[in-house]
């Protein structure tokens, strides 16, 4: 940790620094962020890109009185360090340590909890409205990236904020990944006068004077407005924001602290909503991240000198899915693939490379992705929509109304289902079985390993209705891949026979359950272990047989217990009047914390050792 950073405990300490020290602070922050991220993993490139921006914001604004809201939160590392969490930052993303995202219960400087994209402007507007209703005085600032602006929610909020004309500042962090940078001397000149506080006041005074000219005054003003608007449409990149009712300032250099301090100070003088457009470089200050900002967006542990990962990457469920889809689409031209701004994260990068004309990245627009897929399915295509479980929640209405109500053959590849690890509660995919299971016409499949994933994808592509196929983040199990095979819908698979009780489950934990059951054999306890494979429809014939045994039944899943797979088993037994004792194991009715996947699974009793102990305890009581 550098000597200047050592002197910084809270944002007020930043205001005491000289301009040269502010730039040195930026360098020290980058070094500290790189060091910690190399040891803990994290969202490195986004945070490196906003170091100077973060310093400028905390120099100008008076947090926590002033509210600074970071959209998504990938870029909030410097913010955390500068707001009293400097020493704790070494615990970033570790179990019991600092979250990788802003959290209200972690610090008063985290004005709003985030993790999902495009929410900051809505939250900021809500705070501004609350401020004004209560007669309070403080600034509200939303910091949103150009990528997050592809989300429809952001534009809904911009539209409403522009209409209400409340005092609000939106900082658009343009890291050159989506919005093209405006160029030209005249553009720079127009930007300079737009950031001058004299411009707004002087323009109004000039118009008032011209209007007083007899006969031609009002006409001159109208002509001037048309000419001005014509130039702005051609040359000013903020025209969209102006039309929505915002004052636009920029673009400015997001790595020039002095310039940003000046512009943020000016932004505070406006009575209505303001957009400040800053240009930053994702990964700034670390060669490997600058060269490959997408690859260093989210990283595991890596060597600082080379940028190479500490652990060699293992084959993941995502990779198996992506490559299998490429194989299966080879002779099926009707298969198309859709992602919501996550081509690499969902494994669809392989599909995009092989079939670019059949690949669609819609941006951060999950609702649009699902309904677009529905339209494609109406016209004979076979859309595969690959979205993380936690983000699929955003398109719930579209899944129901546009896909399942019409029984359209859309395949939902639900990635990152279950516990995801260090990204924590905003990213755990623990609700999808519950919110998808209630929807009529939808078939739900859950593979326990990568071979079953391939078979289920094959089955889904051949099914005539909508299918959700959920699988976890991280390394696959390591089983041998066998030929593709059509699975009969709603059939389970018995993995082990036993006489003392039945374990039935789905997904990753079933592998641990099988090992736990095998361990119990050494103690004379014999369990049947069943892979349900389908959460909807269930294998009702097999459940009837299980119920007739009058032995304890234990369900296992990596989903919240409420409304999940175990609940489906309970409902069927209740409907059929089967009095078998059932115990449901899964995620408790709470938001799991962040940490390694194994740590979180252990917390909820879903590891091999914990399941072994739990099975033994349950059987001793029932």
UniProtKB/Swiss-Prot annotation:
GO cellular component, one term: cytosol
PROSITE patterns the UniProt entry points to: TRANSKETOLASE_1, TRANSKETOLASE_2
Signal peptide positions on this chain: none
GO BP term, pick one: 1-deoxy-D-xylulose 5-phosphate biosynthetic process
Binding site for thiamine diphosphate: 74, 115-117, 147-148, 175, 286, 366
Domain of life: Bacteria
Cofactor: how and how many bound: Binds 1 Mg(2+) ion per subunit. Binds 1 thiamine pyrophosphate per subunit.
EC code(s) of this entry: 2.2.1.7
Known cofactor(s): Mg(2+); thiamine diphosphate
Binding site for Mg(2+): 146, 175
Classification via SMART domains: Transket_pyr
Catalytic EC class: transferase
GO molecular-function terms, A-Z: 1-deoxy-D-xylulose-5-phosphate synthase activity; magnesium ion binding; thiamine pyrophosphate binding
CDD domains per record: TPP_DXS (cd02007), TPP_PYR_DXS_TK_like (cd07033)
Keywords linked to the UniProt accession: Isoprene biosynthesis, Magnesium, Metal-binding, Thiamine biosynthesis, Thiamine pyrophosphate, Transferase
Pathway named in the protein's UniProt entry: Metabolic intermediate biosynthesis; 1-deoxy-D-xylulose 5-phosphate biosynthesis; 1-deoxy-D-xylulose 5-phosphate from D-glyceraldehyde 3-phosphate and pyruvate: step 1/1
Catalytic activity: D-glyceraldehyde 3-phosphate + pyruvate + H(+) = 1-deoxy-D-xylulose 5-phosphate + CO2
One Pfam family, short name: DXP_synthase_N
Sequence similarity: Belongs to the transketolase family. DXPS subfamily.
Subunit structure, as described in the record: Homodimer.
HAMAP family: DXP_synth
Functional summary from the UniProt entry: Catalyzes the acyloin condensation reaction between C atoms 2 and 3 of pyruvate and glyceraldehyde 3-phosphate to yield 1-deoxy-D-xylulose-5-phosphate (DXP).
Protein name as catalogued: 1-deoxy-D-xylulose-5-phosphate synthase
Gene: dxs
């Amino acid at each position: 940790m550098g000597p200047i950073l050592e002197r910084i405990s809270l944002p007020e300490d930043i205001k005491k620094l000289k301009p040269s020290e502010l730039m040195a602070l930026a360098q020290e922050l980058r070094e500290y962020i790189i060091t910690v991220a190399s040891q803990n993993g994290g969202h490195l490139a986004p945070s490196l890109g906003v170091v100077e921006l973060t310093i400028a914001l905390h120099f100008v604004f008076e947090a926590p009185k002033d509210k600074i809201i970071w959209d998504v939160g990938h870029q909030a590392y410097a913010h955390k360090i500068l707001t009293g969490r400097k020493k704790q930052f070494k615990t970033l993303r570790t179990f019991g340590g600092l979250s990788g995202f802003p959290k209200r219960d972690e610090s008063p400087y985290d004005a709003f909890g985030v993790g999902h994209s495009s929410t900051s402007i809505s939250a900021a507007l809500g705070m501004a409205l609350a401020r004004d209703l209560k007669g309070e005085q403080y600034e509200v600032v939303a910091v949103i990236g150009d990528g997050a602006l592809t989300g429809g929610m952001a534009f809904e909020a911009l539209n409403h904020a522009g209409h209400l004309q409340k005092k609000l500042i939106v900082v658009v962090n343009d890291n050159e990944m989506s919005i093209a940078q405006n160029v030209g001397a005249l553009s720079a000149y127009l930007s300079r006068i737009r950031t001058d506080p004299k411009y707004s006041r002087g323009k109004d005074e000039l118009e008032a004077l011209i209007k007083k000219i007899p006969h031609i005054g009002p006409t001159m003003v109208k002509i001037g407005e048309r000419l001005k608007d014509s130039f702005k449409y051609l040359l000013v990149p903020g025209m969209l924001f102006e039309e929505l009712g915002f004052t636009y300032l920029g673009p400015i250099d997001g790595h020039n602290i002095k310039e940003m301090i000046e512009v943020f100070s000016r932004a505070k003088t406006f009575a209505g909503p303001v957009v400040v457009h800053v240009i930053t470089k994702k990964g700034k200050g670390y060669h490997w991240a600058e060269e490959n900002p997408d690859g260093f967006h989210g990283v595991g542990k890596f060597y600082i000198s080379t940028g190479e990962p500490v652990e060699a990457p293992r084959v993941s469920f995502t990779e198996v899915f992506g490559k299998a889809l490429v194989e299966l689409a080879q002779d099926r031209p009707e298969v198309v693939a859709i992602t919501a701004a996550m081509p690499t994260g969902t494994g669809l990068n392989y599909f995009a490379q092989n079939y670019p004309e059949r690949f669609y990245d819609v941006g951060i627009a999950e609702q649009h992705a699902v309904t677009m897929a529905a339209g494609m399915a109406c016209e004979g295509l076979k859309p595969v929509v690959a979205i993380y479980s936690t983000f699929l929640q955003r398109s719930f209405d579209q899944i129901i109304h546009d896909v399942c109500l019409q029984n359209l053959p859309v395949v939902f590849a639900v990635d990152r289902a279950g516990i995801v690890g260090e990204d924590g509660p905003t990213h755990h995919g623990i609700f999808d079985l519950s919110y998808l299971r209630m929807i009529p016409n939808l078939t739900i499949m859950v593979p326990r390993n990568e071979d079953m994933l391939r078979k289920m994808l094959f089955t889904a592509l051949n099914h005539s209705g909508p299918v959700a196929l959920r699988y976890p983040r991280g390394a696959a199990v390591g089983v041998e891949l066998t030929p593709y095979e059509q699975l009969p819908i709603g059939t389970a698979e018995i993995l082990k026979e036993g006489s003392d009780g039945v374990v039935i489950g789905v997904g990753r934990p079933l592998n641990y359950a099988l090992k736990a059951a095998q361990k119990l054999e050494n103690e004379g306890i014999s369990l049947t272990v069943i892979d349900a494979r389908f959460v909807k429809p269930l294998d009702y014939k097999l459940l009837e047989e299980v119920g007739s045994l009058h032995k304890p039944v234990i369900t296992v899943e990596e989903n919240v217990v409420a409304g999940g797979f175990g609940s489906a088993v309970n409902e069927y037994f209740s409907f059929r009047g089967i009095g078998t004792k059932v115990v449901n194991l899964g995620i408790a009715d709470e938001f799991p914390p962040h940490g390694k996947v194994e740590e979180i699974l252990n917390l909820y009793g879903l590891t091999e050792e914990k399941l072994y102990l739990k099975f033994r305890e349950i059987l001793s009581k029932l």
